[in-house]
Amino acid sequence: MKRVVIALGGNAILQRGQKGTYEEQMENVRRTAKQIADIILDGDYEVVITHGNGPQVGALLLHMDAGQQVYGIPAQPMDVAGAMTQGQIGYMIGQALINELRKRGVEKPVATIVTQTIVDKNDPAFQNPSKPVGPFYDEETAKKLAKEKGWTVIEDAGRGWRRVVPSPDPKGHVEAPVIVDLVEKGFIVIASGGGGVPVIEENGELKGVEAVIDKDLAGEKLAEEVKADIFMILTDVNGAAINYGKPDEKWLGKVTVDELKRYYKEGHFKKGSMGPKVLAAIRFVEWGGERAVIASLDRAVEALEGKTGTQVVRE
């Protein structure tokens, strides 16, 4: 039986153009659960699931902002917002997956672990916050908040001013031993949601930091920790492409890790979207993973069988 870590993209939870109601998100999650159930039952895989949380954290920060302004309820820090949305999305995925498996006559234990991700307090990202989060403000309000709260703010593409936070590299997960133990006991585990809650270690203690960790890079670290055979990133396109959007665009099928590294260094993959996915795939195969896959959520089973998507191998 092979072990696979599946990193779900945002489209598994919220589609473009949707408002983000609970009903919309749950319907998307139910469709995703069918794909995961197919993988578990048809392919006989041990599955660990991770997921994004960008839109949900964004909405939660807006809720907290409004609550503070209207009702005087203190807003919670970013790391707490990350933990809250891990619980929210993990609950939805877990429930949908249990229900889907039961429909097929299968009882399997599913557990969501609110996960802390260790980062280096000396990571250069802390000196260069770059990840926009939360609501848009006018310039005066943004600069006032920056002064009051110690935030870094930037103008975001002419749409207003926003807070930016660091995006440090993940080093590992505090709960890794628990996750491994559950997987070994036959649990389907949902972990490291949204890249996990970023924490640093100071004088032997863990401390949450206000940052955002890329969920695919954190998912890759999780795949190493559980000693996965395959790391599969599911998104809204059917793989990675070079010369994307140009006349000579070429979608990558089976590709060696050395070829993919060359394309990555040549700048073919956009920083905020495909770039981290490709980097995560490279890291996993270089670590010793059998194969990394980047593919469309709708074709997950075929991609795992190697029939579609970008298949990253050693040679």
From Swiss-Prot:
UniProt KW keywords: ATP-binding, Cytoplasm, Kinase, Nucleotide-binding, Transferase
Catalyzed reaction equations: hydrogencarbonate + NH4(+) + ATP = carbamoyl phosphate + ADP + H2O + H(+)
Tree of life domain: Archaea
GO biological process: arginine deiminase pathway
GO MF annotations, alphabetized: ATP binding; carbamate kinase activity
InterPro entries linked to this entry: AceGlu_kinase-like_sf, Asp/Glu/Uridylate_kinase, Carb_kinase
GO CC term (a single one): cytosol
UniProt KW ATP-binding keyword: yes
Enzyme class, broadest EC rank: transferase
Cellular compartments annotated: Cytoplasm
Entry similarity comment: Belongs to the carbamate kinase family.
Known partners and oligomeric status: Homodimer.
Protein name: Carbamate kinase
Organism: Thermococcus kodakarensis (strain ATCC BAA-918 / JCM 12380 / KOD1) (Pyrococcus kodakaraensis (strain KOD1))
Lineage: Archaea, Methanobacteriati, Methanobacteriota, Thermococci, Thermococcales
